[in-house]
């Protein structure tokens, strides 16, 4: 991997990603709507609950519990629960944070609808030098887009096409094949990828 993870670290990261929201099992809030300020503060404590549940389990690396604690921390110190910055945040926590936010923005939730795919990527890019580590973000987007070759997508104009090539310099400006022609989104400035079909 470009992020320099050994097989051992990758295995630990996989487990950390699987368990990062374990603390939510101790949260009893299940309302189908926007949380009150008090409810939101309680929801934020899932990071601490997860850490407390994992930190003393024998046989798992300390990074697993740290990821549960830190996956809502941000590079600029505006995250929670500790307001950590930059190098004070564990590397695995930074990677899981990026994937967690992508999943949140691109999924339907009781309190918001999924954002169009292109808006998710644009928002991620805008956060590159503030909330998230730029190296991790670039690697995440690169690997994400590479998995979409051969996938069907719906454009903002309603057309459906299959991605056949990714532009390495502008990830959203892909080359697509529709039933009638090839579309190069570098040339079609007003068209964007709205969603991945089947995702």
Task: Give the role of each language-model region.
Residues 1-198:
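Histidine- and acidic-residue-rich, metal-dependent catalytic cores
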